[in-house]
């Protein structure tokens, strides 16, 4: 009875209750406009490592030896994956902002480990001592971000001479490759150059037919001074005159004309 009376009053006076629930219950305005309380369980920031500037000192500390001993940092690490076959690639990164993924990789789980080209003891743990090949990421379990940093740091350490690597020695063979194949041997001269003939056939002298010569003689009769013959073997050399002599001859020419 009381609920029906309340519903009638709410219908007749709608301006008193602008917000009503599903069952005609008035909702206070303050409840809808208040902000959510701040989250108290926010993640704390990642602490700064004391070995950030000198990361090689951490591998000589007592804390590191108590944690890992003489084994590599990835020796006891096991990946979490679905199924019996692990994926061929590890995760992209373990730390995104302040959020750390579950079961982080061997480097990301220890905040005092820093990948640096001067940290030779750490880099040697990810390089095969017999072949000098860098271990793959699925073998060590590091994420792809740290694996990329390790590859760059190892290459930089080798360039600076901090990390030794094997260079295979190749003995020269007895076979001389410069004459064993036509593609790498010396190019032989052209047959025409060996015989002394010109490179192109139209450069060589060809005697015109006698019928054509007689026709030209009749056509240019009285204008021919000498008959044509084969070209000389070498062009005559013109003596070079000094610039002083050339100017003197040019000056003497107009004077003689006058």
UniProtKB/Swiss-Prot annotation:
Residues 244-258 have a biased composition (Polar residues). GO terms for biological process: mitochondrial translation. Transmembrane segments: none annotated. Coiled coil: none annotated. Residues 221-258 are annotated as: Disordered. It is found in: Mitochondrion. Residues 1-35 form a transit peptide. Keywords: Mitochondrion, Phosphoprotein, Ribonucleoprotein, Ribosomal protein, Transit peptide. SUPFAM superfamilies: Ribosomal protein S18. GO terms for cellular component: mitochondrial inner membrane; mitochondrial small ribosomal subunit; mitochondrion. GO terms for molecular function: structural constituent of ribosome. Pfam families: Ribosomal_S18 (PF01084). It comes from the Eukaryota. The modification Phosphoserine is found at residue 49. Component of the mitochondrial ribosome small subunit (28S) which comprises a 12S rRNA and about 30 distinct proteins. Belongs to the bacterial ribosomal protein bS18 family. Mitochondrion-specific ribosomal protein mS40 subfamily. This is Small ribosomal subunit protein mS40. It comes from Bos taurus (Bovine).
